Amino acid sequence: MAYAYLFKYIIIGDTGVGKSCLLLQFTDKRFQPVHDLTIGVEFGARMITIDGKQIKLQIWDTAGQESFRSITRSYYRGAAGALLVYDITRRDTFNHLTTWLEDARQHSNSNMVIMLIGNKSDLESRREVKKEEGEAFAREHGLIFMETSAKTASNVEEAFINTAKEIYEKIQEGVFDINNEANGIKIGPQHAATNASHGSNQGGQQAGGGCC
């Protein structure tokens, strides 16, 4: 399907916080309770609609283990959005957020949109990190924040889509250079075809949109 833009995402955070489960819930609308540890990087994609335009999200799910950190760093470059995930039932995953955030900001473009996600909100009885703590961390570091449950799908759609909306707004404001794919944004055939139809009223033969 033709799209106006392609946005590249990266999902980061400690091992076991539910990164792969969030991706699977968003792309396939299913929950897999037992999931093998991600080795290196996994990939998923889905089309969404923002402001009447088709947007393709290309999502890279990274390994949380320290031994794979150098691989993860290479994927920060060329990402327009990042989902930084912790587990609300494990205080240590929240404590490690600063390290993940510093890593992301050091190796990514300065305009990358970061969504902080407190996952496993369905396990309220085992909560170790208050929602207010997540909100405060997000405020302090200029992040968007949501709590989600990959198991029940609560706020999963919203987390991915709200990140895309923020990226789209930055495009409209001219913050992102959309002609530089290093920013994690690619102009699609739908966008090119729309511009071509606006730019020519001479009745001449127009070339069709290319494929990507």
Curated annotation (Swiss-Prot):
What Gene Ontology terms describe what this protein does at the molecular function level? G protein activity; GDP binding; GTP binding; GTPase activity
User: How does it sit in the bilayer?
Assistant: Lipid-anchor
Per the UniProt entry, what is one GO biological process? Golgi organization
What's in the keyword line of the UniProt record? Acetylation, Cytoplasmic vesicle, Endoplasmic reticulum, ER-Golgi transport, Golgi apparatus, GTP-binding, Hydrolase, Lipoprotein, Magnesium, Membrane, Metal-binding, Nucleotide-binding, Prenylation, Protein transport, Transport
Q: Lipid anchor (S-geranylgeranyl cysteine) at which residues?
A: 211-212
Q: Name one GO cellular component term.
A: Golgi apparatus
- Where Mg(2+) is bound, by residue? 20, 38, 61
Amino acids binding GTP: 16-21, 38, 64, 119-120, 122, 150-151
Q: Which residues does the record list as N-acetylalanine (modified residue)?
A: 2
Hey, what's the signal peptide range on this chain? Answer: none
Region entry Disordered, spans: 190-212
> Entry's PROSITE patterns?
RAB (PS51419)
Write down the EC number.
3.6.5.2
Q: Sorted alphabetically, which Pfam families does this protein's record hold?
A: Ras
Modification(s) after translation? Prenylated. Prenylation is required for association with cellular membranes.
Q: What is known of its domains?
A: Switch I, switch II and the interswitch regions are characteristic of Rab GTPases and mediate the interactions with Rab downstream effectors. The switch regions undergo conformational changes upon nucleotide binding which drives interaction with specific sets of effector proteins, with most effectors only binding to GTP-bound Rab.
Instruction: Summarize the protein's role.
Output: The small GTPases Rab are key regulators of intracellular membrane trafficking, from the formation of transport vesicles to their fusion with membranes. Rabs cycle between active GTP-bound and inactive GDP-bound states. In their active state, drive transport of vesicular carriers from donor organelles to acceptor organelles to regulate the membrane traffic that maintains organelle identity and morphology.
Q: Which family does it belong to?
A: Belongs to the small GTPase superfamily. Rab family.
- The protein depicted here goes by the name Ras-related protein Rab-2A
**Organism, as annotated:** Mus musculus
